[in-house]
Amino acid sequence: MDWGTELWDQFEVLERHTQWGLDLLDRYVKFVKERTEVEQAYAKQLRSLVKKYLPKRPAKDDPESKFSQQQSFVQILQEVNDFAGQRELVAENLSVRVCLELTKYSQEMKQERKMHFQEGRRAQQQLENGFKQLENSKRKFERDCREAEKAAQTAERLDQDINATKADVEKAKQQAHLRSHMAEESKNEYAAQLQRFNRDQAHFYFSQMPQIFDKLQDMDERRATRLGAGYGLLSEAELEVVPIIAKCLEGMKVAANAVDPKNDSHVLIELHKSGFARPGDVEFEDFSQPMNRAPSDSSLGTPSDGRPELRGPGRSRTKRWPFGKKNKPRPPPLSPLGGPVPSALPNGPPSPRSGRDPLAILSEISKSVKPRLASFRSLRGSRGTVVTEDFSHLPPEQQRKRLQQQLEERSRELQKEVDQREALKKMKDVYEKTPQMGDPASLEPQIAETLSNIERLKLEVQKYEAWLAEAESRVLSNRGDSLSRHARPPDPPASAPPDSSSNSASQDTKESSEEPPSEESQDTPIYTEFDEDFEEEPTSPIGHCVAIYHFEGSSEGTISMAEGEDLSLMEEDKGDGWTRVRRKEGGEGYVPTSYLRVTLN
């Protein structure tokens, strides 16, 4: 079935239908264009989302990147980013294959449709013109027939009239004959025009217009076929990216399955294991025994100058709780009259170690002086922490790992330089054997530079090996101390009832007479409590300073210095007016901050 046969009289219907088909094509192109914009906006938002949640720091500088949870999350973000790329690819394919192609095809269809309908309208106009000519010839024939009949009647009337002259009769007959001849010619013209119109009309309805309608049908069917193919491109663009999107989803699933809680726990241990030994048992302090508060009493273990005796390194104890914050030294205690203790300097800041009474000294120390281990500074993240080359600012375990990393890096660099030196030597030998390939002397600067780098890296490797050995020994020592303390059972407290103080005193006297006094028995519990305040691991200086004025350093915890003396800065002023320094010949202590000119590293 075709339009030329079945719809020969539906010219306007076909015109509306073909216009609707082209409008539908344009609507689909517009839909795909907006769909492309949606895909592009979706991909852009996905990329922005991924960029927002990706780690800002490089993986090598981000400790969190070592955890499988973080790695899986980053992998999921990367898969989402790849997914966004596939959405962009869908948008690009739709834009090129559908929007551009169908827009161009729609313009071609509009031109073809316009041409066909112009041809049909010309045929209609020609047929209408033929019909008008037929009508004109018909009216002329009708008019001529009436005129001929009228002339014949007039001639017949004059012929019968006896009063009419012979000349009038002849004239009337001639006029009737002329009119009859004109009517005959009009008849022949009308018949010819009618025959011509019928032929044109048959050609119009049976040949010309059916051909035009068939062309319109073919055009519309081609348009519909192309539109259906455009519908298919919409799904094909999606199907093309389905395998990649499936891989993205599979990658997300793999990332989800890659989360390893046990490994993350192990990584946390590797990152933050300090290597410190666990705290030992808290010693029992017996306050039931009478104590003499005189400064000269030797039972307190206080020297005659009023300074408490510091315990040696072999008797140091582990810190009780390494995670507590260190407080700044408190102001000096008040005198019995309520005022501050006089300073050793007339115009200087108050001394951090004032007073001569041992118990007052110990009370002041326990309130003002806190442990200053370098490793504990790193745990609390103090602003005064100084990053040293040997990583001594880190806990022992972390120091060992960082030193191991540095040693491996230096070893790789050393091997690279050695390989480069060997390659340069081989190239030099080739140049010497075949001078046309190059000048051997041109390689001397590179060889010399490589040798210099090798020597430098060897020294660095030796340096890091020594530091690593020291750090490993410290870690092993801490582990051994911790295990030995853990294995040793705690000492039972030697407490006595309040009403048996005399018996306890006599028993102590008896035991002391039977056993020789030892170094450990001479240390009373009150000194055991404060020995950790005096024991510090050696730390690296954070700067240097020069003494502007002379300072005697007669108070407890201070150190003397001469005007112009160079000192190492060990700890900055915490706001109390005192700074801890170290002398070149040894010895550390506090001096007034206003007496120094400080330069930080």
UniProtKB/Swiss-Prot annotation:
Q: Where in the cell is it found?
A: Cytoplasm, Cytoskeleton; Cytoplasm, Cell cortex; Lysosome; Golgi apparatus
According to its UniProt entry, the function of this protein is described as:
Required for translocation of GLUT4 to the plasma membrane in response to insulin signaling. Required to coordinate membrane tubulation with reorganization of the actin cytoskeleton during endocytosis. Binds to lipids such as phosphatidylinositol 4,5-bisphosphate and phosphatidylserine and promotes membrane invagination and the formation of tubules. Also promotes CDC42-induced actin polymerization by recruiting WASL/N-WASP which in turn activates the Arp2/3 complex. Actin polymerization may promote the fission of membrane tubules to form endocytic vesicles.
State the organism of origin.
Homo sapiens
Query: What sections of the sequence does the record tag as coiled-coil?
Result: 67-259, 388-481
Region named Disordered: 280-358, 390-420, 479-543
Domain text: The F-BAR domain binds the phospholipid membrane with its concave surface. The end-to-end polymerization of dimers of these domains provides a curved surface that fits best membranes with around 600 A diameter, and may drive tubulation.
Q: Which UniProt keywords apply?
A: Cell membrane, Cell projection, Coiled coil, Cytoplasm, Cytoskeleton, Endocytosis, Golgi apparatus, Lipid-binding, Lysosome, Membrane, Phosphoprotein, SH3 domain
Task: List every stretch annotated Interaction with PDE6G.
Answer: 293-601
Where does the REM-1 domain lie? Answer: 393-470
* Interaction with ARHGAP17, DAAM1, DIAPH1 and DIAPH2: annotated segments: 546-601
Q: Where is this region: Interaction with DNM2 and WASL?
A: 487-541
Q: How is it modified after translation?
A: Tyrosine phosphorylated. Also phosphorylated by PKA.
- Tell me which tissues or organs this protein is expressed in: Expressed in brain, colon, heart, kidney, liver, lung, megakaryocyte, ovary, pancreas, peripheral blood lymphocytes, placenta, prostate, skeletal muscle, small intestine, spleen, testis, thymus and trachea.
Basic and acidic residues compositional bias, start-end: 407-420
Q: What induces it?
A: Induced by adriamycin treatment and this effect is counteracted by HGF/SF. Expression is reduced during differentiation.
Q: Note down the stretches annotated as region Required for interaction with FASLG and localization to lysosomes.
A: 471-601
**What is this protein called in UniProt?**
Cdc42-interacting protein 4
The annotated regions of Polar residues compositional bias extend over 289-302
Family the entry assigns:
Belongs to the FNBP1 family.
Pfam families attached to this UniProt entry: FCH (PF00611), SH3_1 (PF00018)
Superkingdom to which the source organism belongs: Eukaryota
Q: Where is this region: Interaction with CDC42?
A: 293-537
Subunit structure comment from the entry = Interacts specifically with GTP-bound RHOQ. Interacts with DNM2 and PDE6G. Homodimerizes, the dimers can polymerize end-to-end to form filamentous structures. Interacts specifically with GTP-bound CDC42. Interacts with AKAP9, ARHGAP17, DAAM1, DIAPH1, DIAPH2, DNM1, FASLG/FASL, GAPVD1, LYN, microtubules, SRC, WAS/WASP and WASL/N-WASP. Interacts with the ligand binding domain of the thyroid receptor (TR) in the presence of thyroid hormone. May interact with CTNNB1 and HD/HTT.
Q: Where is the F-BAR domain?
A: 1-264
